[in-house]
A protein has these predicted regions:
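Core segments of alpha-helical transmembrane spans in multipass integral membrane proteins
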Residues: 347, 369-389, 399-409
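Hydrophobic alpha-helical membrane segments
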Residues: 378, 396-416, 433-440
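Non-cytosolic membrane-interface motifs at loop->transmembrane helix junctions
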Residues: 363-373, 420-434
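Cytosolic juxtamembrane helix and N-cap/initiation of the first transmembrane helix
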Residues: 328-344
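Hydrophobic transmembrane helix segments
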Residues: 341-376, 380
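A conserved beta-strand-loop-helix scaffold within acyl/acetyltransferase catalytic domains
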Residues: 4-58, 87-99, 103, 116-134, ...
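Membrane-water interface at the C-terminal end of transmembrane alpha helices
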Residues: 435-460
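Juxtamembrane "helix-exit" motif on the non-cytosolic side of transmembrane helices
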Residues: 351-362, 410-422
Length: 460
């Protein structure tokens, strides 16, 4: 299958036909805003698709221009236009090694496959062939689906919507927007759709969009149901390489926080493991044996804070407030509260151990042995919470909530006995020591109830 012609709409045609970044086509999604520069010679004629967070314009990839040499000037003009509107600006998921006036932060890498090399890849890797064999042995069949089968109200559309809801419900975080919004039906005539069926029932679905300027495809969504046999995802991707055999490349998109990232990014990857399996995403894409990995960047104006632009980007994905997004995620996903409690418990435990070791036990009005025992208990609790965050089970959460409840009762009783002290440091530390177990007990109790509800809702 060749890459289709761009849409007939002139603006959309200019956008998708010139875009070389893998995410360029996603600019057609409903939530995107478009900035168009003045045509030459007054401007560059560039198009930039972006999300407006209220304080920043976060672009989807780099500027799209007829002349690649105009990308850097277009980036500068977009930043200036954002500033005139009272917004910061950055470019998320650009593949350009440099944009004029911008610094770059490596976000991760994306795998690149060449369809013509796929048969040789299969021939070299027995495990990959075995995955395909498993799915076929379970009578999974993949077929290409046309837009007419996916119109609103059609049986297949209803099945895909069901699969999407099931898939989103299995995620550890709330659904996100911007470049990862689940919107497979925009510009359907441009998509490559594949359905994996078993016994006439849909078990997985794949959507790919063109990268026109590189004669390639981006696999934007792979939805896999609970009943999909092992190897179903690989069978879908094998079908992509077959149907798009005339393309120059196919990519599965960004594997975030992978590749030669900075130490602080590796720490962030480790800390957020219960929320997003960064290593698992990279491992899945790697086991298909791409011909190469390409870097993907965040570009932001020189002299500005990279942290601020990262927060802007996260707000674009959260479709608003990060606090509200975190609250929704914590309320609905039982693995999140134990993780949110475990992370601050690590420095708190270190503080308790330091106070015990230095003899400053008057700060919390405990004896040194009691404080050392408390630090040991909290260290064990943090380890258990991290473990539960990966596999939240109602029984485990209820047990830990009970332990936190005992800690809360003892802490409140101790505070009633010795008071909050006199100096600011004593008051702050003792207030934290009293409030934390109470908050933890409430959060873990909620998580246990939520996990119990989800476990009862699972099909037998």
């Amino acid at each position: 299958m060749t890459v289709p012609d761009p849409p007939r709409d002139p603006d959309a045609a200019a956008l998708v036909a010139r875009g070389a970044d893998a995410v360029s086509f996603l600019a057609l999604e409903r939530a995107m805003h478009h900035w168009r520069d003045a045509p030459p010679p007054a401007g560059t004629g560039a198009l930039v698709a972006y999300a407006d967070t209220g304080s920043a314009w976060v672009a989807a990839g780099g500027p799209i221009t007829a002349d690649p040499d105009q990308r850097a000037p277009a980036a500068a003009r977009f930043v200036a236009a954002a500033a005139a509107a009272g917004r910061r600006a950055c470019f998320f998921a650009t593949e350009s090694p440099a944009l004029g006036g911008c610094n770059q932060l490596l976000l991760g890498e994306q795998p690149v496959f060449e369809p013509r090399a796929w048969p040789a890849t299969l021939a070299r890797h027995r495990r990959l062939r075995e995955q395909l064999r498993r799915a076929r042995a379970k009578e999974v069949r993949v077929r290409r689906v046309g837009p007419a089968e996916l119109v609103d109200g059609s049986p297949l559309r209803a099945e895909v919507d069901r699969l999407a809801g099931e898939w989103l419900g299995s995620r550890r975080m709330e659904p996100m927007g911007f470049l990862v919004a689940l919107e497979p039906f925009h510009a359907p005539e441009q998509h490559l759709y594949l359905a994996a069926e078993r016994g006439g029932a849909l078990v997985a679905f794949l959507s790919a969009v063109p990268i026109h300027a590189r004669r390639g495809w981006l696999v934007e969504d792979v939805l896999r149901g609970r009943d999909a046999p092992n190897g179903t995802a690989e069978l879908l991707l094998d079908a992509v390489f077959t149907h798009a055999r005339d393309a120059e490349l196919i990519t599965l998109g960004l594997a975030p926080l992978s590749g030669p990232i900075a130490p602080w990014q590796r720490l962030a990857r480790w800390l957020t493991r219960p929320l997003y399996d960064f290593r698992g995403v990279r491992a899945f894409k790697a086991r298909l044996h791409p011909v190469r990995w390409e870097p993907v960047w965040l570009a932001y104006p020189r002299g500005s804070s990279v942290l601020r632009h990262l927060i802007d980007s996260l707000r674009a994905f959260a479709s608003g407030s990060l606090v509200r997004f975190a609250a929704r995620t914590a309320a609905r996903h039982p693995g999140v509260p134990p993780w949110l409690l475990a992370v601050p418990l690590v420095p708190w435990t270190a503080l308790l151990a330091t106070i015990a070791a230095t003899g400053n036990v008057h700060l919390l009005a405990y004896s040194r042995p009691a404080l050392a025992g408390w630090a040991t208990f909290d260290a064990f609790l943090a380890a258990v919470l991290f473990r539960i965050a990966f596999r939240p089970r109602a029984r485990w959460l209820a047990t830990v909530a009970g332990a936190a409840g005992v800690d809360a009762v003892l802490s409140v009783a101790h505070r009633i006995d010795v008071g909050f002290g006199h100096g600011p440091l004593q008051i702050i530390l003792r207030a934290m020591a009293t409030a934390a177990p109470l908050v933890g007990t409430a959060a873990l109790t909620w998580a246990a109830l939520r996990a119990s509800f989800l476990e009862r809702s699972q099909p037998p």
